[in-house]
Design a protein with these regions (language model features):
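Hydrophobic anchor residue at the start of the ABC signature
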Residues: 90, 102, 118
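Helix-to-loop junction immediately C-terminal to a conserved catalytic motif
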Residues: 6
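Conserved ABC ATPase signature
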Residues: 76-80, 84
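Q-loop/switch helix immediately C-terminal to the Walker
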Residues: 37, 44-59
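H-loop/switch region of ABC-family ATPase nucleotide-binding domains
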Residues: 137-138
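Helical segment within the ABC ATPase nucleotide-binding domain
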Residues: 116-129
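Conserved ABC transporter NBD signature motif
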Residues: 11-27
Length: 159
């Protein structure tokens, strides 16, 4: 469902629209998906600077806010931990052109303190830019704390 809503899968009946417009098929998509497993979607042949440049290059302050060390920009994805990759994945999705974020378990690879820091930063950016956000999570206390509305899906594979 997240891939459909973010425009990555388009073999279904109907349209996904944002602000009355269909999602673009080729250029930058204003709906960005933050994957649960960033190691599966990052090009292993690109250094992390290239991974960010594909979307945008945040300034040094934002890199620091997300706990990304500048030295990591010269590394390949396989040289970073899951938590470090997740920080890049989240930051990459926060392109200034992004209007809506779909966050699929975006903090599960992070320790508790970093989870709070990243979520606080993301929520602040989402509010300041007047963006929308869909959070997919099994962490119900987290969902209850940060979500305005909650929809529960049970056994969606059994449908």
């Amino acid at each position: 469902m997240c891939k459909i809503l973010s425009g990555y899968v388009n073999k279904f009946e109907g349209d996904v629209t944002l602000d009355g417009q269909k999602l673009p098929k080729k250029e930058f998509c204003p709906v960005q998906l933050i994957y649960q497993h960033p190691e599966k979607v990052m090009n292993p042949k690109w250094k992390m600077k290239e991974v960010l440049d594909e979307s945008w290059m945040p300034d040094d302050n934002l890199l620091s806010e997300f706990g990304i060390q500048k030295s990591w920009l010269t590394r390949f994805p396989q040289e970073l931990s899951g938590g470090e990759l997740q920080r890049f994945s989240v930051l990459r999705a926060l392109n200034p052109k992004t209007k809506f974020i779909i966050a699929d378990e975006m903090t599960t690879m992070l320790d508790a303190i970093t989870q709070v820091q990243i979520l606080t930063s993301v929520i602040e950016i989402v509010k300041n830019r007047n963006m929308g956000m869909l959070l997919v999570s099994h962490d119900m206390p987290l969902v209850d704390r940060i979500c305005d509305e909650v929809i529960y899906l049970n056994d969606i594979n059994g449908v």
